Amino acid sequence: KEGYIVNHSTGCKYECYKLGDNDYCLRECKLQYGKGAGGYCYAFGCWCTHLYEQAVVWPLPKKTCN
């Protein structure tokens, strides 16, 4: 599974500005989804890879980013 890492309290994606390989995104993906996860910056959001099937990613149901 893949997807954008999401802030559970705001419903927003984690923003990033350095597209492609991004240490911040990689670190945040591993913190939230485990050491097997990968991550990079795609379309100014942190995109996480190698997630378990039940991983919660953006968008959250009934929670818009505000």
Swiss-Prot record:
It is found in: Secreted. Its main location: secreted. SMART domains: Knot1. One of its GO terms (cellular component) is extracellular region. Expressed by the venom gland. PROSITE patterns: LCN_CSAB (PS51863). Is susceptible to be slightly neutralized by human antibodies scFvs 10FG2. SUPFAM superfamilies: Scorpion toxin-like. Keywords: Disulfide bond, Ion channel impairing toxin, Neurotoxin, Secreted, Toxin, Voltage-gated sodium channel impairing toxin. GO terms for biological process: defense response. Residues 1-66 form the LCN-type CS-alpha/beta domain. Disulfide bonds join 12-65, 16-41, 25-46, 29-48. GO terms for molecular function: sodium channel inhibitor activity; toxin activity. Beta toxins bind voltage-independently at site-4 of sodium channels (Nav) and reduces peak current and shifts the voltage of activation toward more negative potentials thereby affecting sodium channel activation and promoting spontaneous and repetitive firing. This toxin is slightly toxic to mice. Has the structural arrangement of an alpha-helix connected to antiparallel beta-sheets by disulfide bonds (CS-alpha/beta). Belongs to the long (4 C-C) scorpion toxin superfamily. Sodium channel inhibitor family. Beta subfamily. This is Beta-mammal toxin Cv2.
